[in-house]
């Protein structure tokens, strides 16, 4: 299994810049032995997205011996919620957007604070919920204070189950500002609850999320904010993307469906 290529620290989109360059270099170098062992000695390789297939094709391993394992979502809580028909109207929801993920450079969380600052210039009372923990927690808190966004951004820490679902129910959009990703499963959770997404147009996300998410030119923070504002101010566009999001996750991301797909790829007739 090989689920994330370490970013080359000298690449433009590498999250390991400045004082973190050495850390990124060590990370990249440490992964090379595993990559070559898997590439030349494994009978079957699991990767997380379609762009990662090609690096493992060799003269002895064809494409059919490389399986994309995308991950999945338990869609049953959202399905039950929709069947009840008692959901919160968009205009009454507490959060304008939410983020779920590790507070790490790769996830674009520092960029997210600047993006939300731009959103607040147009909608001063807009609110963002951030779910997750990670090494950038302190830096994020300082940046929020520095930008005067204490009333606009709520850090909720780690949430799971009902607590996390309650945030989805109270949100209008899910944001995925990752600057480096091999697929990105976090937004799928919110999309299962009918939340349209906004992300950067990363290569891996093209096959993961062909619909349900507004893709933004990498790494244009103003354009990202504009996509958020577009969804918040256009009910018809929000509804269309919301339906696309929930349908995509229901049809392609449900765990039972994913398990069947993987089984048929690995245990071929």
Language-model features: where?
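Conserved acidic donor-binding segment of nucleotide-sugar-dependent glycosyltransferases
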Residues: 213-222, 230-235
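Conserved donor-binding/catalytic core segment of Leloir-type glycosyltransferases
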Residues: 46, 89-116
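A charged, aromatic-enriched C-terminal amphipathic alpha-helix characteristic of glycosyltransferases
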Residues: 236-267
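Membrane-proximal helix-turn-helix segments that form the acceptor-binding/catalytic region
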Residues: 21-45
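Nucleotide-activated donor-binding/catalytic signature segment of Leloir-type glycosyltransferases, i.e.
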Residues: 141-159
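Carbohydrate-associated surface elements
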Residues: 51, 72
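Short hydrophobic beta-strand element within catalytic cores of glycosyltransferases
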Residues: 196-199
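Aromatic "clamp/platform" in nucleotide-sugar-dependent glycosyltransferases that forms part
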Residues: 179
């Amino acid at each position: 299994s090989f689920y994330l290529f370490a970013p080359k620290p000298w690449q433009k989109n590498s999250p390991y810049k400045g004082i973190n360059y050495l850390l990124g270099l060590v990370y990249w170098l440490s992964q090379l032995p595993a990559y070559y062992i898997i590439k030349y000695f494994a009978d079957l390789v699991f990767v997380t997205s379609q762009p990662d297939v090609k690096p493992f094709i060799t003269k002895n391993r064809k494409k059919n011996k490389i399986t994309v394992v995308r991950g999945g979502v338990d869609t049953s809580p959202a399905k039950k919620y929709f069947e009840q028909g008692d959901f919160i109207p968009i205009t009454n929801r507490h959060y304008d957007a939410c983020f779920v993920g590790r507070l790490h450079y790769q996830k674009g969380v520092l960029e997210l604070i600047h993006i939300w600052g731009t959103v607040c210039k147009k909608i001063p009372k807009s609110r963002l919920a951030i779910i997750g923990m990670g090494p950038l927690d302190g830096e994020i808190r300082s940046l929020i204070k520095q930008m005067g966004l204490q009333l606009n951004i709520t850090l909720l820490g780690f949430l799971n189950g009902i607590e996390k679902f309650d945030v989805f129910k109270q949100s209008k959009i899910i944001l995925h500002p990752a600057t480096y990703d091999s697929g990105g499963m976090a937004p799928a959770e919110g999309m299962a609850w009918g939340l349209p997404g906004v992300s950067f147009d990363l290569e891996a996300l093209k096959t993961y999320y062909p619909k349900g998410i507004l893709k933004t030119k990498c790494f244009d923070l103003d354009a990202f904010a504009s996509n958020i504002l577009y969804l918040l101010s256009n009910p018809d566009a929000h509804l269309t993307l919301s339906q696309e999001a929930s349908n995509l996750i229901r049809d392609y991301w449900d765990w039972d469906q994913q398990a069947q797909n993987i089984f048929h790829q690995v245990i071929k007739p």
